[in-house]
């Protein structure tokens, strides 16, 4: 099976959990027999692990025709993807995008990460997805989180292939129920157009069903996996805490989605029973001052 996957970040350039999850599912799919994954990223840097997926830099896909020679293209993009792909994509430009802000290769630039003009970059990404979908041979589309849902929808419209969206979180989770209408609209549009909705937890699945009004029959809970601890790490001797203060750490975003209030409640319960435990929180988020 050939998978056209749309992602927003990928190790080693990690801005959040999405990069790790994207890498993990690419690795897991690659381990299955007869799987071929093409992963589209806004701005790959060239040092990404390509063991499990062929990476396409959306900033190297032309949307406006430019007559450039092979050596120049090779010099510009060969650290990201094969120059031959540039010309393949150029042959599938589907509209006149010369009015867009493109570079000398006819490609759009991306800042990488989550810039202030994020919604503009999401739209640009979806435009480029139309070129990619017209050029590639694939069986299914996999779109990671709301940032890539418009791209996934465009690829489905172009190809007629089924769209599977991967909901790593919803705006209800990220905003404690105070949703951004624009983000909600993008999320719901992606869900409405999806043939399959993968949710990272049953809670997320119920949110998708109840808050986004989706058919439960196309919503599936697919939990994130964990890597077994390497043997050399298991063999490290554990320190002796006998008679010493024990330390329990919360490390992550201090936001509702990560449950920091449960950590505080647990600390309160434990400290009412024993005094040799110290609870430490490290991170930032909208619940920081509570």
Set out the residue ranges of the language-model regions:
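Short His-centered aromatic/hydrophobic patch
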Residues: 143-148
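A short, histidine- and acid-enriched strand-loop-helix "catalytic/donor-clamping" loop
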Residues: 138, 150, 165-180, 193-196
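A conserved catalytic-core segment of Leloir-type glycosyltransferases
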Residues: 33-133
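Membrane-proximal helix-turn-helix segments that form the acceptor-binding/catalytic region
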Residues: 130-135, 157, 180-197
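Carbohydrate-associated surface elements
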Residues: 203, 225
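Nucleotide-sugar donor phosphate/pyrophosphate-binding loop at the beta->alpha transition
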Residues: 118-128, 161-164, 172-189, 228, ...
């Amino acid at each position: 099976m050939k998978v056209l996957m749309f992602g927003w970040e990928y190790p080693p350039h990690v801005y959040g959990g999405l990069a790790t999850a994207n890498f993990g599912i690419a690795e897991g799919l690659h381990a299955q027999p007869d799987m071929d994954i093409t992963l589209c990223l806004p701005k790959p840097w060239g040092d990404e692990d390509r063991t499990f997926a062929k990476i396409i830099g959306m900033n190297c896909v032309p949307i406006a025709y430019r007559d450039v020679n092979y050596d120049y293209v090779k010099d510009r993009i060969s650290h990201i993807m094969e120059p031959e792909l540039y010309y393949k994509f150029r042959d599938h430009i589907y509209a006149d995008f010369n009015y867009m802000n493109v570079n000398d290769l006819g490609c759009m630039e991306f800042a990488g990460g989550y810039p202030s003009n994020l919604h503009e970059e999401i739209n640009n990404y979806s435009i480029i997805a139309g070129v990619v979908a017209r050029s590639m041979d694939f069986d299914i589309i996999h779109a990671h989180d709301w940032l890539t849902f418009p791209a996934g929808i465009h690829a489905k419209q172009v190809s007629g292939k089924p769209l599977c969206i991967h909901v790593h979180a919803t705006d209800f989770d990220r905003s404690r129920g105070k949703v951004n209408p624009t983000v909600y609209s993008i999320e719901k549009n992606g869900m409405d157009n999806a043939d399959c909705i993968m949710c990272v937890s049953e809670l997320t699945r119920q949110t998708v069903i109840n808050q986004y009004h989706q058919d439960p029959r196309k919503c599936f809970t697919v939990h994130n996996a964990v890597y077994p601890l390497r043997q050399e790490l298991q063999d490290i001797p554990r320190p002796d805490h006998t008679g010493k203060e024990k330390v329990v750490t919360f490390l992550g975003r201090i936001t509702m989605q990560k449950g920091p209030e449960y950590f505080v409640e647990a600390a309160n319960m434990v400290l009412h029973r024993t005094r040799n435990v110290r609870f430490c929180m490290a991170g930032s988020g909208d619940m920081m001052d509570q």
